[in-house]
């Protein structure tokens, strides 16, 4: 005689399927919302800053990507844009700023100096900020044209939309200063 317990695996599977379906919808919705509400923290160190200001001007209209408003506190930002050359003395400061941004967060390397050290191939310059923080999008150029920056922002939006987003993320809290560089 069949008991109630015989049905449990099927019920569990259906519940898991439903949860997976709902999680997929939530993830898609959160991804859509997050990719259009990027609050950038510009970490500007060098000449690329002039081009960064151009991108922020009305002509290129960053607002249509939901990324117009810079935040000057990492606690209010979710997108760290590193603009320009980073030297070894600045490296711990950059890492500290990254750690102060709440999850979920993303990083863009703006220009060849931030991406790879550029032509400053010397002992004092960090040869790419991915040695200090994980980078989501690299924008080439010295300095990059505003169109390249917009292209980079759109690439980042695609990446955000494709990521898994949860309403509540139960990851253990990191110990400040001891997190690994990769995510
Ligand atoms: S990439 Fe070129 S413009 Fe940008 S900070 Fe380096 S040297 Fe300056």
Swiss-Prot record:
Free-text remark on how the cofactor is bound: Binds 1 [4Fe-4S] cluster.
* Catalytic activity from the UniProt record: a quinone + NADH + 5 H(+)(in) = a quinol + NAD(+) + 4 H(+)(out)
GO BP terms, alphabetized: aerobic respiration; electron transport coupled proton transport
EC number(s) reported in the record: 7.1.1.-
* A molecular function (GO) term: NADH dehydrogenase (ubiquinone) activity
Signal peptide as annotated in the record: none
Q: Does Ligase show up as a keyword for this record? A: no
Which SUPFAM superfamilies does this entry report, sorted A to Z? HydA/Nqo6-like
Give the cofactors, semicolon-separated.
[4Fe-4S] cluster
Q: Which GO terms describe its cellular component?
A: plasma membrane; respiratory chain complex I
Subunit structure and binding partners: NDH-1 is composed of 14 different subunits. Subunits NuoB, C, D, E, F, and G constitute the peripheral sector of the complex.
This one is known as NADH-quinone oxidoreductase subunit B 2
Q: Which organism is it from?
A: Anaeromyxobacter sp. (strain Fw109-5)
Question: Which taxonomic lineage does the organism of this UniProt entry have?
Answer: Bacteria, Pseudomonadati, Myxococcota, Myxococcia, Myxococcales
Recorded name of the encoding gene: nuoB2
């Amino acid at each position: 005689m069949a008991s109630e317990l015989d049905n449990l695996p099927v019920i569990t599977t259906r519940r898991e399927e439903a949860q997976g379906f709902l999680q997929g919808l939530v993830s898609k919705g959160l991804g859509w919302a997050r990719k259009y509400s990027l609050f950038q923290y510009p970490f500007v160190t060098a000449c690329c800053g002039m081009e960064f200001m151009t991108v922020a001007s009305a002509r290129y209209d960053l607002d249509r990507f939901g990324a117009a408003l810079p935040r000057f506190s990492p606690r209010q930002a979710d997108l760290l844009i590193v603009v320009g050359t980073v030297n070894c003395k600045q490296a711990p400061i950059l890492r500290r700023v990254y750690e102060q941004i709440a999850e979920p967060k993303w990083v863009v390397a703006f220009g060849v100096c931030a991406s790879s050290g550029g032509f400053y191939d010397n002992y004092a310059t960090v040869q790419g900020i991915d040695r200090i923080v994980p980078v989501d999008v690299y924008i080439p150029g010295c300095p990059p044209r505003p169109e390249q920056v917009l292209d980079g922002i759109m690439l980042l939006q695609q990446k955000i939309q494709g990521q898994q987003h949860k309403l509540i993320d139960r990851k253990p809290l990191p110990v400040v200063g001891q997190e690994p560089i990769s995510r």
